[in-house]
């Protein structure tokens, strides 16, 4: 392998790393939204409060994806 090929492979590893970093928040969002819907079905009177807490949790989970995205550029 020449140096150009190695540089191309090393550049593509950042993309793979971000793809793996995005899996965790994706799974977290699915679990969070699913449990909120399940809880609202069990206790409809708490729907508004559960929705507020869900959006707060969504913000925290999305921060993980953004950190992975930023890290891909920083460690490039």
Curated annotation (Swiss-Prot):
Coiled coil regions, renumbered to chain: none
Segments traversing the membrane: 13-33, 55-75
Cellular component annotations (GO), alphabetically ordered: plasma membrane; proton-transporting ATP synthase complex; proton-transporting two-sector ATPase complex, proton-transporting domain
Name of the protein in question: ATP synthase subunit c
Gene from which the chain derives: atpE
Membrane topology value: Multi-pass membrane protein
Known function: F(1)F(0) ATP synthase produces ATP from ADP in the presence of a proton or sodium gradient. F-type ATPases consist of two structural domains, F(1) containing the extramembraneous catalytic core and F(0) containing the membrane proton channel, linked together by a central stalk and a peripheral stalk. During catalysis, ATP synthesis in the catalytic domain of F(1) is coupled via a rotary mechanism of the central stalk subunits to proton translocation. Key component of the F(0) channel; it plays a direct role in translocation across the membrane. A homomeric c-ring of between 10-14 subunits forms the central stalk rotor element with the F(1) delta and epsilon subunits.
HAMAP family: ATP_synth_c_bact
PROSITE patterns in the record: ATPASE_C (PS00605)
InterPro entries, sorted: ATP_synth_csu_bac/chlpt (IPR005953), ATP_synth_F0_csu (IPR000454), ATP_synth_F0_csu_DDCD_BS (IPR020537), ATP_synth_F0_csu_sf (IPR038662), ATPase_proteolipid_c-like_dom (IPR002379), F/V-ATP_Csub_sf (IPR035921)
Record GO terms (molecular function): lipid binding; proton-transporting ATP synthase activity, rotational mechanism
Subcellular location: Cell membrane
Subunit structure: F-type ATPases have 2 components, F(1) - the catalytic core - and F(0) - the membrane proton channel. F(1) has five subunits: alpha(3), beta(3), gamma(1), delta(1), epsilon(1). F(0) has three main subunits: a(1), b(2) and c(10-14). The alpha and beta chains form an alternating ring which encloses part of the gamma chain. F(1) is attached to F(0) by a central stalk formed by the gamma and epsilon chains, while a peripheral stalk is formed by the delta and b chains.
Superkingdom of source: Bacteria
Keyword terms: ATP synthesis, Cell membrane, CF(0), Hydrogen ion transport, Ion transport, Lipid-binding, Membrane, Transmembrane, Transmembrane helix, Transport
Sequence similarity: Belongs to the ATPase C chain family.
């Amino acid at each position: 392998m020449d140096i150009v090929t190695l540089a191309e492979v090393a550049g593509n590893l950042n993309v793979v790393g971000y793809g793996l970093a995005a899996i965790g928040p994706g799974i977290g969002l699915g679990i969070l939204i699913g449990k909120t819907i399940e809880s609202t079905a069990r206790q409809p009177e708490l729907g508004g409060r559960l929705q507020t807490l869900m959006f707060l949790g969504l913000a925290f989970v999305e921060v993980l994806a953004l950190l992975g995205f930023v890290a891909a550029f920083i460690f490039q």
